[in-house]
Amino acid sequence: MNILLVLIGILLFEILIISHEWGHFITAKTFGVKVNEFALGMGPKIFSVQKGETNFSIRILPFGGFCAMEGEDETSSNPRAFNNIKPWKRIIVLAAGATMNIIVGFIFTLIVIAQNNSFVSTTISGFAENSVSQTCGLQAGDEIIKVNGTHVFTPKDINFAILTSDKNSFDFKVRRNGEKTEVKNIEFEKLEKEDGTKALKVDFKLGKTQKNFLTVIKEAFLDMVSTVQITFLSFLGMITGKFSLKELTGPVGMVSMIGSATSKGLEVSLLAAINNML
């Protein structure tokens, strides 16, 4: 892989780490907790500077980072130790990392979404010739809201529900003329690719939503919600045995994926990072 792409992947990954640890740092300082060190990276130090009571360091391995608070890992008698502040403050400090990831993720998503001139919606605009789904009862204008029980916020939720299903048929819940309707037992045509892998022919088309300020905000929010849902369902699938560990991407795989995506453009690269943020 091109070294530049690897570096871009590492940079994006570190932005996520910095935002996460900064959330812990800024809330800890707000509540008067003593922060001994704020580190970017892991392993031996290659650079450090002392500012006030906190040592800021950069470490040799560009993966991870930490915010070392007094009394975080062991009991301390210091009145400014993490273990000595009120429980509700500890909860806020601990939750601040994930909160910052959500905020930064939303900003990244907003930047990516804003590049599009229009957005693919979850509303059916038409069908392929001899469409099975149309014969089963789906209609143009139907807004897809569930597939096999999975909530649909964006088109990628439809893809996820279909690709990860262990059933041969699909139950759709749609909003039609303002009312919710169910269309059950849709069996898409099975296809076999040149490499021998099997696939399903999804025979309906989705419409588009025009870009304006409100739709950009809405699409960014829905994309974040969709990402959270897919992440949760993926981990749930791993726990229940539906998915294997090999299907989950760790930090190293994430950098490789981001690097590969970068060669296809900024939009794909940022989305790769965002989808691994939570």
Task: Write out the residue ranges for each language-model feature.
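Internal alpha-helical transmembrane segments
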Residues: 37, 56-57, 61-126
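Conserved PDZ fold ligand-binding element
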Residues: 133-155, 224
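Residue-level signature of transmembrane alpha-helical entry/exit and packing/kink sites
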Residues: 1, 5, 9, 86-94, ...
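Functional transmembrane alpha-helices
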Residues: 85, 128, 187-278
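Residue-level signature of catalytic and energy-coupling elements of molecular machines
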Residues: 20, 58, 97, 158, ...
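Small-residue-rich helix-interface/hinge motifs
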Residues: 4-77, 278
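PDZ-domain C-terminal substructure recognizer with occasional recognition of PDZ-binding tails
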Residues: 139, 145-146, 157-205
